[in-house]
Structures are given as structure tokens and as C-alpha cells.
Regions:
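Glycine-rich phosphate-binding loops at beta-strand->alpha-helix junctions
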Residues: 68, 124-148
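Gly/Thr-rich phosphate-binding beta-strand-loop-beta motif of the actin/hexokinase/Hsp70
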Residues: 1-22, 71, 142
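Acidic, glycine/GT-rich loop-and beta-edge segments that sit at the periphery of enzyme/chaperone cores
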Residues: 52, 71, 172-189
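Phosphate/ATP-binding catalytic cores across multiple sugar-kinase/actin-like superfamilies
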Residues: 100-128, 173-176
Length: 189
């Protein structure tokens, strides 16, 4: 069997797939948009400035990490001062961002752990050897694979094309529909 962790914008799904079917699935309505929102909330509460969704996403991409990383640097952030209404610059550190997003990241990691706990024992050996596969844009958060690996003791492999993995898989299913047809017919809705 294979274990896939898909972290999208609004949801995170972890599934174990074996012999053309889903063995176990754990899905939560938490994703990378929630990480962005947590950054916005933190900057508003701790620094008194409002930032937009795009700025929060830029912060996540530039200095966001799920675990401490070597050679971390802060970033200059520009927003609107909540008191004066004027533009204001602040310096934001990676430690602050990690603190801001920790609750969201923990929910994602806990979801992976719950899915792992439902895996039949005979399949556990597969994951210990091959590991889990991380896909989706949310999986690009630096240090996330390492944090999942640390908290589950199972290797995590990043898809070489995490943003395209889901659509490529769907395309593969369409191209090979006749071969995979029995899997689709047996799928639960």
C-alpha cells in the first residue's frame, strides 16, 4: 500500500491506498489558506498592523517553516497600522511565523497520525520502508515533511511535482479508465 498526504488550500487529506482501493482516509478542513490566515491574525494581534492574504502567503513562502531550519532570516513586512491607518513596516522573524502557524500545522500532523493509527498492522511495514508521499501546495511549507517524519517515525517523501500531483493522478486515471474501471465502480460515495 501507499500513503498519500495531500495538503491543499482548504483541506488536508491523508489516505492509504492499496490494491486499487482506499484502505483508510482522514480528511480535515484545514489547509494552507488557514496557515495564511494564522499569519494575518498574528501580525494584527502582535504588531498592530493589517496585512492582506497575498502578503501573508508571501511571508509563508519566504520565512515560514514548520520546524527550525538552518540560516533562518527575518523579513520586512509592510502593512497598514491599525491605529493611524498609515503604512507601517515591521521586521518579522521565522520564530514568530512558526509560533503563529503552529496550531494549524499541528492539526495537519495530528490528522496524519490518526490516519496512520487506522492502518492494518500488516501494511505498516510498507510505510516504514517506503515512507509516505507528501503532495499539494501546502506540502511546500519548509520543514513540514521533517516535522511529520519526526512525529510519526515514518519517512516522508516530497512529490517532485507537489502542485501538479493530484491533477496528474486524475489524468492517469482518465487515460487508464478501462484498466482502473473496477476500482471506480467499487468506490464509495
Amino acid at each position: 500500500g501507499n500513503m498519500i498526504i495531500d495538503i491543499g488550500g482548504g483541506t488536508s487529506e491523508t489516505a492509504v491506498i492499496s490494491l486499487g482501493g482506499v484502505v483508510t482516509l482522514e480528511a480535515i478542513r484545514v489547509g494552507s489558506f488557514d496557515i495564511d490566515a494564522a499569519i494575518q491574525t498574528y501580525v494584527r494581534r502582535e504588531h498592530g498592523i493589517a496585512i492582506g492574504e497575498r502578503t501573508a502567503e508571501d511571508i509563508k513562502i519566504q520565512i515560514g517553516t514548520a520546524t527550525p531550519m538552518p540560516n533562518e532570516r527575518g523579513a520586512q513586512v509592510r502593512g497598514r497600522d491599525l491605529v493611524t491607518g498609515l503604512p507601517k513596516n515591521i521586521m518579522l522573524t521565522p520564530e514568530e511565523v512558526r509560533f503563529a502557524i503552529d496550531e494549524v500545522v499541528s492539526q495537519i500532523v495530528n490528522s496524519v497520525t490518526r490516519c496512520l493509527s487506522k492502518v492494518p498492522p500488516e501494511m505498516a511495514q510498507d510505510f516504514l520502508q517506503r515512507g509516505m508521499y507528501l503532495v499539494g501546495g501546502g506540502g511546500l511549507l519548509r520543514g513540514l515533511a521533517q516535522r511529520i517524519e519526526k512525529e510519526t517515525d515514518v519517512p516522508v517523501r516530497m512529490s517532485p511535482m507537489p502542485l501538479e500531483a493530484v491533477v496528474l493522478g486524475a489524468g492517469h486515471c482518465v487515460e487508464n479508465y478501462q484498466v482502473l474501471r473496477s476500482m471506480f465502480m467499487g468506490a464509495r460515495r
